C-alpha cells in the first residue's frame, strides 16, 4: 500500500510537466463553461439523496462509465452493487466533482486522475488529490452549498450555523430571482458538514470508508458550546497554512480559473471574492507560492 501511495504521489505531483498541467487546466475551463450552460448557473441543493460522497464512490463511478455504461442503465444497481438511491448519489457526485458530463461520459480530468493504467491517483490515496477535488467541488458549480459557503457565507460570518446558511441561501436565491426549499437547503448543509467534518462518533464509519471524502483536509471544525443543540452548532472554516497542498495543484487552480488571463495579481488570489477555488485551497505562505509560480512560469 505504501509503495502504491508513493507511486501515485510521484505521478501526480512530481513528474507532470507545466505543459501537462496547463493543458488539463484549460480543458477544465471549457468543462466548467459547459456545466454553466447546462445548469444555467442555477442554485442546486439536491441530487445526492442525502449521502455525502464516500471514499470509493468516485473510483467506482468512473470505472462504471469508462466501460460505456450510464447511470440510467437498467442494470446500474446490479453492476455498481448499491441501491437505486446510491446510484443516483454516485452519479450526482461524479458531476459535482467535474468528473462526468451530462451524458455520463468521463471528463479529461477523470481520465487523468482515475484511469487504472496511467491515472495519477486512481484510489484517491494522496491528500493532494483531496485538495484538487475540493477545488473541483467549488468551481464545477453543481453543488451550490460549497461555493456559497466558501465564497460568501464565511465572509459574512466567521462562525456560522445551519440557520445562518439557510438565511444566506435565501438571500442568494432572491438575488437570482429563484426560490429555495428550506428543508432541502438544511439537508444539503448536513451533507456539507459530513463531507468536511468527521465527528469522533464516526471512527467506525471511517474504517468502513463511509465518512465524507474531504474530512482529512481538516478545513472545518465545530465550536462547542454548552447546551447547544445539534442544529445550533457553530462551525468555523480554518484559515491556517496547509503544507500538504502540492505545488502542482496550486498551479492547476490558477490556470483553470476562467477569470485569469496571462497574468494575475497575487493579492487577487488571496483577497478577491469568488476565488474560492484557489484562495480557499488555504495554500502555503506567500514566499512559497511565489516560488511555485516562478518555478513553472520561468521555463
What role is predicted for each listed range?
Residues 11-20:
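Polybasic, low-complexity terminal segments and linkers that are predominantly intrinsically disordered
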Residues 26-299:
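Donor-sugar nucleotide-binding helix/loop cap in glycosyltransferases
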Residues 3-7:
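Cationic, low-complexity basic patches in intrinsically disordered or flexible, solvent-exposed regions
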Amino acid at each position: 500500500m505504501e509503495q502504491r501511495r508513493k507511486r501515485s504521489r510521484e505521478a501526480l505531483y512530481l513528474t507532470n510537466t507545466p505543459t501537462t498541467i496547463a493543458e488539463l487546466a484549460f480543458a477544465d475551463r471549457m468543462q466548467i463553461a459547459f456545466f454553466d450552460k447546462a445548469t444555467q448557473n442555477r442554485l442546486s441543493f439536491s441530487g445526492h439523496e442525502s449521502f455525502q460522497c464516500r471514499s470509493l464512490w468516485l473510483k467506482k463511478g468512473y470505472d462504471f462509465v469508462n466501460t460505456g455504461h450510464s447511470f440510467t442503465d437498467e442494470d446500474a444497481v446490479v453492476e455498481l452493487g448499491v441501491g437505486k438511491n446510491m446510484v443516483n448519489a454516485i452519479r450526482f457526485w461524479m458531476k459535482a466533482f467535474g468528473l462526468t458530463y451530462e451524458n455520463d461520459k468521463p471528463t479529461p480530468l477523470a481520465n487523468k486522475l482515475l484511469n487504472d493504467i496511467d491515472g495519477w491517483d486512481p484510489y484517491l490515496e494522496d491528500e493532494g488529490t483531496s485538495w484538487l477535488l475540493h477545488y473541483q467541488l467549488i468551481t464545477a458549480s453543481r453543488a451550490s452549498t460549497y461555493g456559497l459557503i466558501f465564497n460568501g457565507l464565511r465572509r459574512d460570518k466567521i462562525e456560522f450555523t445551519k440557520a445562518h446558511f439557510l438565511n444566506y441561501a435565501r438571500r442568494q436565491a432572491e438575488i437570482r430571482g429563484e426560490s429555495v426549499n428550506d428543508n432541502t437547503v438544511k439537508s444539503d448543509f448536513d451533507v456539507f458538514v459530513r463531507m468536511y467534518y468527521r465527528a469522533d462518533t464516526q471512527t467506525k464509519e471511517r474504517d468502513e470508508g463511509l465518512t465524507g471524502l474531504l474530512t482529512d483536509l481538516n478545513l472545518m471544525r465545530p465550536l462547542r458550546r454548552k447546551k447547544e443543540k445539534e442544529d445550533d452548532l457553530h462551525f468555523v472554516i480554518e484559515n491556517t497554512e496547509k503544507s500538504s497542498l502540492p505545488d502542482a495543484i496550486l498551479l492547476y487552480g490558477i490556470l483553470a480559473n476562467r477569470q485569469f488571463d496571462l497574468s494575475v495579481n497575487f493579492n487577487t488570489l488571496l483577497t478577491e471574492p469568488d476565488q474560492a477555488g484557489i484562495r480557499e485551497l488555504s495554500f502555503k505562505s506567500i514566499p512559497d507560492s511565489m516560488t511555485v509560480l516562478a518555478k513553472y512560469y520561468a521555463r
